[in-house]
Amino acid sequence: MASAHHSRRPRETSQTSQSEMSVGRYTRLGQIGKGSFATVYQGVHTKSRTYVAIKSVNLSQLNKKLKENLFSEIHILKGLYHPHIVALIDCHETTSHIHLVMEYCALGDLSQFIRHRNTLGEHRYTRDMIAKYPNPRGGALNEVVVRHFLKQLASALKFLRDRNLIHRDIKPQNLLLCPSPTSYRAGVAQIVPFKGSEDSFSPATGLDSLPMLKIADFGFARSLPATSLAETLCGSPLYMAPEILRYEKYDAKADLWSVGTVLYEMVVGKPPFRASNHVELLRRIERGEDNIKFPPENPASDDIKALIRMLLKRNPVERMNFADFFESNVITSPIPGLIPDDTGTLRRPSADLDPLGQNSPAEPQPSPGAAAGSRREKDVSREDQITYPQRTTAQTPRSGTPPSSVPMRRGGSADKAPSTPKDTATTYPQRPSTVSHATAPGRQELLDRNATTAAMERQRNRHTFGPSQHERPVDKAKEEQERAAQDVAFERDYVVVEKRAVEVNAFADELAHSPRIQGGFTRNAQTGAISRRATVQGPQTTATSPLASNTKAMQVFPGRSRADSTHARQSSYERRYGQSPTSATSAISKALNMASGRLFGMGFSPPMAITKGGRSPPLAYNPFPAYPAAQPTLLPIGDGSKTNATLDEDAKTVQVIEECATRSDVVYGFAEVKYKQLIPLAPSVPTDPSGRSSLPGGYREPSDSTDGGLTVDAVVTLSEEALVLYVKALSLLAKSMDIASAWWNRKNRVDVFGDSTINRTDASMTVVGSRINNVVQWVRSRFNEVLEKAEFVRLKLIEGQKRLPPDHPSHPNNHSIGSSLGSGASVDVVVSPGVTAEKLMYDRALEMSRAAAINELTGEDLSGCEIAYVTAIRMLEAVLEEDEMPSTAGDKADRKDGEQTMLDSVQAEDRQVVVKLVSSIRGRLTALQKKLTVLAKRPTGSLGKTPSSNLTPVAHAVGATPPR
């Protein structure tokens, strides 16, 4: 057990169970789930022994955007006190983590409740509910239960709307359930949850005899008045409003679409629209033309169906508004079909609704100087957590209140008769404050639930309340497969522009933790592919895991290619929303490349032809080779080498990923030249004779006095050029991740289906996987670095443009409305006409190749000439690089072999110019390499004299170049 020492800043323990530690007045117990950047633990108050959920967020690998997300969540939760909203009880901080103490909900989330509805009658918490209100044939939940949950959801949403808050991620996984108040009073529960407020477990509406619903996870919530519009991509795809899928501005009505999808799922048992990607999802919504269909045998009432149809209007203008929703008959009228015992038990907010029904000693209210986040504490209902026999893994935790998969019981406390407490004051204690902000903890993955029928049967054997051991195993397996496909086919939680960074880190973490990559992948001769699949089914949840930023995006990955899925799912990296985290398959890639208008709110005026002269001032840039150690020659791709024909599919994938990463490294090096001229030199940093810094990084916030003597116009020029180059580098890095992700999904799919055409040994898989993992980890590190620097440069550009004369074309007052692609961003960035990454790269490659040709003719620095040629080729290949993977095999087949890396945005005539230049440089490179080979064989041969050069090498951090 962790130390009972209570401190403001919890200290990690070194005992055997590293998850146990002191968090203020709470003891953090075992892990019950893991999400993106956050691990959820069960916790207990060290004095009252009441239970909480502690979300521990790792701060070490989080970017600024995600930290703002978590800070926003904490800030919002501080001011929310409502029975149907999960409360933030306390907040504690260490140097590496921030710990959020949340209310504990024992019944899991609504998605699990619906999914396992056929076994609810066998659990003591829901046995009485099913006896009174059995689930209908042809439907999901009994309409009484549906209306009960909807009333409570509407109560919480009205509370949010009164405060101009929009949740932006309403979905069954974020709707948590607690045992009914009557189950507490009957002494059924054995775990006592800690109350966030006096009425935390007293429903504001609905029935006392049914489970209580709470909204959780406010990582995407924001203040949005009724007349305001937003444009950030947030929410879960299956429950996302079509206006968000279309990248249009939206208002609070987006939440009402999500409510409609949740209501439909409660009635039917599945979401109204399902697809393998966002584009297909939007297509199906549009194709439906607001004609919401219900299964013929579904017994839902006309009122419920009409409400769903009014909520699921594609056009937000036609969609029901909040006022009409809150005043609808389904919300305001009594629930029909109640049994006599439940008639007249509709609950309203009051002070006598204590779930325990007994007086609990309250701790004195702490003074303002007490530990941050100190709150009034009381014992509450003795509550057990529900486990579902079909699940083969731990219960999916949700923000703040996930139960563990094994009920925790306290002896001697189960059957104690409760009593009723006195009324309490309506004054609420203050929410805890936090000193620093962490990134938004990601949602926990949806773990695989149906590896095999045998695994399901074994899981049933572990539960005394499960169905009969001999009951319909085949049917249950099919049912689980169908539901798993529904859950995982499109279970990408975070759909936000900044999410690309999360996804990159997620996939890198997945590979780093995979036992297959680490050599732990083993075959079972008896169970075959299914057994092998089970070895990578769930995430690694050890407390000693070196990488803590495991996002949902990462942990959903294995399940995304499970055999039982009925969807042709694509990896999250194949979806770029005009940004990873989707062209019609990927909108984020368009924003990352073109250059990531949505990511940086950046607009572009029409680019000039890349063959024209650039406006970049003379810059010192020294070419460098990528992958110098492991590459036998410096020949670029497409050189006709016969060895390519002998490479198997995995080796080809490795080569493509490494080459794409290499091109990104070349572009990054060029961007660094621009970037370093914008960064002031630290006093302790040595300089070269030209006075230029040799540091690979070390930037800090801009100020008027830190421009190093540059004019305002020069600052704007450098910022624009650095920004477009960084964005180009990001697009190439993202593509590397896309390719690796597709390979990983393909490997998992092959293992599940047991494809006999792939005959690869475990050792070979480990070698290939390790090599890809090395590149992926490098890409992750570089992506995060470039993202931060691009944001810095963007801010620098905005600052510089504001300092320009009012009549300057680049002054913000002179930007045309149509010139900005980032109209939804808080601050738009417009780049001057002609400033494109492709043009800058072309000009630089041409300059380098010409200089190298002159040196080659004079016999000077031949090895440097080789490097210059290779770098120029790589840079031109990056110009021609397609920023999105072909969405279909037909797309790839339509391209000639030599044009598969062409960029559609480059004009055809300009493309031909680049292709000819690449061919010319390759010819010179081949001739030079032959010359170098001959010279190398001469005992006293020289590779040419080293010329004096005015080019300053671009410094790179140790290990900065892509590994092989």
Swiss-Prot record:
InterPro entries for the chain:
Atg1-like, ATG1-like_MIT2, Atg1-like_tMIT, Kinase-like_dom_sf, Prot_kinase_dom, Protein_kinase_ATP_BS, Ser/Thr_kinase_AS
Compositionally skewed regions (Polar residues) per UniProt: 387-403, 421-437, 537-553, 943-952
**Active site, UniProt feature:** D169
Give the EC number(s) under which this enzyme is classified. Answer: 2.7.11.1
Stretches with biased composition (Basic and acidic residues)? 374-385, 469-485, 561-577
**Cell compartment(s), UniProt:** Cytoplasm; Preautophagosomal structure membrane
- Coiled coil segments of this chain: none
Listed binding positions for ATP are I32, G33, K34, G35, S36, F37, A38, T39, V40, K55
Role summary: Serine/threonine protein kinase involved in the cytoplasm to vacuole transport (Cvt) and found to be essential in autophagy, where it is required for the formation of autophagosomes. Involved in the clearance of protein aggregates which cannot be efficiently cleared by the proteasome. Required for selective autophagic degradation of the nucleus (nucleophagy) as well as for mitophagy which contributes to regulate mitochondrial quantity and quality by eliminating the mitochondria to a basal level to fulfill cellular energy requirements and preventing excess ROS production.
Name of the protein in its database record:
Serine/threonine-protein kinase atg1
* GN (gene name): atg1
